[in-house]
A protein has these predicted regions:
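Divalent-metal-activated hydrolytic enzyme cores
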Residues: 1-20, 41-53, 65-72, 82-137
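Short, solvent-exposed amphipathic alpha-helical segments in soluble enzyme
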Residues: 22-29
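A short beta-strand-loop structural module common to alpha/beta enzyme folds
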Residues: 31-41
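Acidic/histidine-rich, metal-coordinating catalytic segments
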Residues: 78
Length: 137
């Protein structure tokens, strides 16, 4: 088995690709982690539009665990996320503090869900600002 440090889930939003890449590299995770990219990042687990979306993302995480045994499952959510906004879950255009506050509430839900499903894995959720700053929630 090839061992990965992490399974990292990001949003597909092109505006954050550089911030994600820079952050992943700064943590020493580049080339050491499985990468999954879906619209809304953690949203499909905490407020899926359909059961398919949740099952699909969980399947990718399960495959990462089965194939590469990552120690940590990491979600990189972000400010002004269209994936979260598609049904108004977290509206776009919020002030940064309010956006981060709402993401924090969902981050706590995704941490619990992943911990319950995969209790031997550490779970972390980060929040990327549009200008590139990334912080743990």
């Amino acid at each position: 088995m090839h061992k990965a440090k992490n399974c990292i889930i990001t949003c597909i939003d092109f505006r954050l690709q550089k911030a994600y890449a820079d952050f992943i590299a700064s943590q020493g995770w580049l080339g050491e982690s499985d990468l999954i990219s879906v619209a809304g990042c953690s949203r499909d687990l905490v407020k899926p539009l359909s059961d398919f979306h949740k099952a699909s993302l969980l399947r990718q995480i399960e495959l990462s665990i089965k194939l590469h045994d990552p120690d940590t499952i990491i979600f990189l959510d972000h400010q002004d996320c269209g994936g979260y906004a598609q049904d108004g879950t977290i509206p776009q255009g919020l002030e940064l503090d309010e956006d981060k506050k709402q993401h924090t509430a969902y981050a706590n839900k995704v941490k619990k869900l992943i911990h319950d499903l995969f209790p031997t894995r550490e779970v972390k959720v980060y929040f990327a600002q549009l200008e590139g700053k990334v912080e743990e929630l």
